[in-house]
Each structure stands twice: as structure tokens, then as C-alpha cells.
From Swiss-Prot:
Catalyzes the base-exchange of a guanine (G) residue with the queuine precursor 7-aminomethyl-7-deazaguanine (PreQ1) at position 34 (anticodon wobble position) in tRNAs with GU(N) anticodons (tRNA-Asp, -Asn, -His and -Tyr). Catalysis occurs through a double-displacement mechanism. The nucleophile active site attacks the C1' of nucleotide 34 to detach the guanine base from the RNA, forming a covalent enzyme-RNA intermediate. The proton acceptor active site deprotonates the incoming PreQ1, allowing a nucleophilic attack on the C1' of the ribose to form the product. Its cofactor is Zn(2+). NCBIfam families: Q_tRNA_tgt, tgt_general. It comes from Methylibium petroleiphilum (strain ATCC BAA-1232 / LMG 22953 / PM1). It holds the Pfam family TGT. The gene is tgt. This is Queuine tRNA-ribosyltransferase. Substrate binds at residues 90-94, 144, 193, 220. Pathway: tRNA modification; tRNA-queuosine biosynthesis.
Amino acid sequence: MLRFDLLHTEGHARRGRLTLNHGVVETPIFMPVGTYGTVKGVMPASLEAMGAQIILGNTFHLWLRPGLDVLRQFGGLHRFENWQRPILTDSGGFQVWSLGAMRKISEEGVKFASPVNGDKLFLTPETSMQIQTVLNSDIVMQFDECTPYETSGHLTTEQEARASMELSLRWAARCKTEFARLENPNALFGIVQGGMFEPLRQASLDALVAMDFPGYAIGGVSVGEPKDEMLRIMAHTPHRLPAHKPRYLMGVGTPEDLVEGVTQGVDLFDCVMPTRNARNGHLFTRHGDLRLRNARYKTDERPIDESCTCTACNGFSRAYLHHLDRCGEMLGPMLTSIHNLHYFLNLMREVREALDAGRFEAFRAQFRADRARGV
């Protein structure tokens, strides 16, 4: 089940409401990433309390561990990880792509050695649909080949990008057929590919729209390309997708990227950045980024962000968090992860409120000014 209601627009920016089998998602929204069935260091109840409406799981990693027998026993991912709101699962295409020389791509699928135990595995569009059906994720992603920015040490050529994009389209058709055969009650999204070549992006988009997916994603960005190239594709693709269906920008990105994505018509975002950066002392605030490992914070009594209402900013000083990081105490990355996720989720809440009020452009200008001010 998927229903998308477009509530308001301002330029290309959209305010929407997405209804899925496990609940309603107000868009635009940021989706925390729970690769192995957990958003690292954060309890599900804490995620919900800070405003998370939908989270991610990873098909590839969950297939390897704990495996389908365990997930089938629990009736899917929701009960297994104690999260009763919507879940989106990636198809495994990006993870297979990231294996590099360890994998071999053919028309049929991808052969690779398991990074867990070295077993020889074969992942196909059909297998991906079967795994995601067991996971019972509300949004299922098609199995695709992530077109790299560089191929074998050189920039990916248009010919190489075309071959990759056309393979993903053939896989999309196979995913749609298998998804229907399985009678999966959830929603399958197609993924626009085409590298950094706008005509290929348009060709991919047109072919996927003709297949009539319930929603669409923009893939193959934030894969090593310069920021201006990513922004060019972000400006080209989202608003050309059907207005009455949700749009998802995969794996992006910084707070600035999210606001720019909303400007270009994106509804859904995900990225590991809030939690990964938190574990490395890189924190996001209203007034720019804070590098917690800097010695200047050793005696700083202020919270991470004085305007923030998260648990980490309610009674914990920068000095204390700096101390936890220096000592390798597990409470440190737990608190900083909560802060960064709260910041991203709150940013998107403010975006929605600005769109509701018809003042998104004014919000965007103030956001840029605040972030440029510095901590």
C-alpha cells in the first residue's frame, strides 16, 4: 500500500503526506539508516521521540546476517528490531557495487564473495525482491547497478554509463514482475540512474515512469563525484519525476544538501552521515559544524547547540562529551548520535513548517545565514 498526497508546493519544493502499511510519513523527511536492523547506538523509542517517522534497513547485510530464516520467524524486520513505524529497505545494489573487484556483474545478476565468511553468493533482481518480501519493508527498492563516477581508474564514459543504466532498467522490469508474482502488499520504487549524463538520466526516468512504479528514487549520486556535479544532477532530475508520486534522493547528505534537495523537489532523504560523523566527533549545529575533538572544547561548559532540545544538549557540556570521546566511553557516541539525528530530523520539521506557512524561501535564506555564522 502506498498513497501520496501533495499538500502544498513552493517552486519545486513540496509538502506531502505518504501513507504506508505501517503508518503515515510527513514529507519532506530524513530517514535514519539502520543498516543491520539498528540505528547505531540509538534505541527505537528514542528515535520515535525525536521525530523519526521512517527508517532504513539494508537488504544485503540482513540477508547475510541474521539471515532469512530468522527474519521469517519474526514475520519481518518490524518485530525483529522493535520498530512499528514504516521501514524502507535498500535493494543491495549499492553494497554489491562497493565490493569492487570482489564482484562480477552479468545480465543475470551479481556473483560475489560474502564479506562475512567468503561464501560464493549470487544476487539477482528476483532474489532481492524475495529477500525484501521476507523483510516486509514498507518501501522496497528495485535491484540496480549503481553507476560509478570512476570506472577502472578513469571517469565513467557516457557509453559505460549508458550500458549500466540500461542494465538497471532491465533489472527494474524483472523486479516489477517478481514483486507482483510474490503478491507483496508494500510499495516498489524504481531508481533513476545514468551517471553524470543528463540525457541518460532523462532516458532512465522516462523508461521507469512508463513502467509505472508507485515511487521513484534518484540513485548514483554521492558516489565520489565533485559536489558541483552532484548539485547539477539534483537540479536536473527530481522535478521531472511525476508530481503525484514520492521522490527519494539516495544517500544524501549534509544539512545543506537536504535543503537544496527540497528546493529541487525531493521528498525523502537518507544518509549515514549523522551517526557516522557523530562517532568521529563531528557534530551538526544550527550555526555550523563542531569538531568535538578540538582541544578548545576541553573546558567548554556550553552544550553542543544552545538552541537544541535533544538529550545530549540537555545537561551535558561540550567538555564532558570531549572527555567521553577522548576516553573511548560508549556513552559519548550514543549522545552525539542522538544529537546529530535530532538535528537532521528537526531541520526537516522546520522545513515542513516553512512549507506549510508558504515561507520556504525565507527559511532557506535564514538557514544558510545561520549555518555560515559558525560555532
